[in-house]
């Protein structure tokens, strides 16, 4: 089963994608962020939010290497730290996750609030 959040439905979508669900919304980025925020609400584990001008990925990978021998670590893949990458990263949380490491990067003023609401960090690293 595949699921899509879209602003415009594809032509002939039910025939072209018989095993898929489509959720039509006004703003797909906003919908993805709110869905990820609700998903994050389901987990009561330590969540480390990592931000800053440089070094986010290196710090995340370093912490993952330190923690992974003793815990199941869920982390942002590669440099998924954007308005779309963060929600996709948070979707990786599952019942096996014991700690999460998520990067948050911004490209313009005001973006960090949305990322903070999605990540809901219990620990912050700048």
What are these regions (language model features)?
Residues 1-34:
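N-terminal leader/targeting and accessory segments in enzymes
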Residues 24, 30-126:
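Phosphate-binding loop of NTP-binding sites
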């Amino acid at each position: 089963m595949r699921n899509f959040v879209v602003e415009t439905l594809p032509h002939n979508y039910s025939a072209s994608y018989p095993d898929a669900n489509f959720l039509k919304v006004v703003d797909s980025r906003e919908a993805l962020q709110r869905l990820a925020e609700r998903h994050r609400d389901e987990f009561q584990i330590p969540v480390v939010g990592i931000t800053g001008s440089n070094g986010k990925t290196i710090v995340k990978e370093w912490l993952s290497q330190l923690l992974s021998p003793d815990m199941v670590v869920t982390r942002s893949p590669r440099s998924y730290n954007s308005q779309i990458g963060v929600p996709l990263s948070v979707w990786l949380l599952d019942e096996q996750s014991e700690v999460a490491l998520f990067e948050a990067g911004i490209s313009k003023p005001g973006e960090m609030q949305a990322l903070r609401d999605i990540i809901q960090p219990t620990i912050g690293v700048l």
